Amino acid sequence: MGNLLKVLTREIENYPHFFLDFENAQPTEGEREIWNQISAVLQDSESILTDLQAYKGAGPEIRDAIQNPNDIQLQEKAWNAVCPLVVRLKRFYEFSIRLEKALQSLLESLTCPPYTPTQHLEREQALAKEFAEILHFTLRFDELKMRNPAIQNDFSYYRRTISRNRINNMHLDIENEVNNEMANRMSLFYAEATPMLKTLSNATMHFVSENKTLPIENTTDCLSTMTSVCKVMLETPEYRSRFTSEETLMFCMRVMVGVIILYDHVHPVGAFCKTSKIDMKGCIKVLKEQAPDSVEGLLNALRFTTKHLNDESTSKQIRAMLQ
């Protein structure tokens, strides 16, 4: 326990090295049941990202159909291009629901009495690693989604075509797979700039409101502690040297940023105010010490997807660091 506290307070000279082992943490017997549940969800995350990365959209077909409204062949070509894409978008959306449930199970484990969030993170490293993997996935998904306007365009065209055909009393086979209620929910999901982050934020707020006997600090302290551990691992040569690849370094930075953003959305006054338990200046400094091309996306995530950066309570110095 003392080791992790020393990590958090930077007393790092004379103690057995401790760090959150993002590469090798294995579940204890006490963690195994929840770990298995979360693992079953996370095993699909890479295929979701690969599928999203390969998503090219039906832009040319839609454009041709809109420019030639009386050409039935072009209308059919656009529709046949869009339908399989909508089925893929449904898969992404359904994964977000599974992720939401997974996060709530993790939060329950990592915040429950009698242990403090810090004690939980030290005792349950495999669950902390899964929490980190959820955040890592979330930032990667949202980065890819933000760079792909085809998703919104395809889905809008799909909704318009369905509505037009309803007026003409036509029922299309795809409505058996993506009915009106599902389409409405998907529409709200994809309308968000960062849909997976919004999902995690909602899941965390829902967890807090459902567990009224649990102080909100238990949840926000879990997040701020995770941020501190990531920051100290990144800025301490002894810890960095234990990462076996650049990929783990990037993973750690992405997780740190993901937790900051989540904290900023969940905490009543956010991550940037003076009373915040997150050392924002230190976190930004750590990012800026890396190769610019590797962290620009993460700095942009702090600039554009946090909630409280532009509040009056945010210091000018922090704002200037993110200019």
From Swiss-Prot:
Protein location: Membrane
Q: Which GO terms describe its cellular component?
A: membrane
Membrane in keyword set:
yes
Q: How does it sit in the membrane?
A: Lipid-anchor
Taxonomically, the superkingdom here is: Eukaryota
- InterPro entries, from UniProt? CYRI, CYRIA/CYRIB_Rac1-bd
Query: What are the record keywords, sorted?
Result: Lipoprotein, Membrane
Q: What is its main location?
A: membrane
Q: Which GO terms describe its biological process?
A: regulation of actin filament polymerization
Select a single GO molecular function from the record's annotations and give it.
small GTPase binding
A Pfam family of the record is: CYRIA-B_Rac1-bd
The keyword Methyltransferase is assigned to this record = no
Complex and partners: Interacts with RAC1 (GTP-bound form preferentially).
Record-stated family: Belongs to the CYRI family.
What is the recorded function of this protein according to its Swiss-Prot or TrEMBL entry?
May negatively regulate RAC1 signaling and RAC1-driven cytoskeletal remodeling. May regulate chemotaxis, cell migration and epithelial polarization by controlling the polarity, plasticity, duration and extent of protrusions.
The name this protein carries in UniProt is CYFIP-related Rac1 interactor A
Q: Its encoding gene is what?
A: Cyria
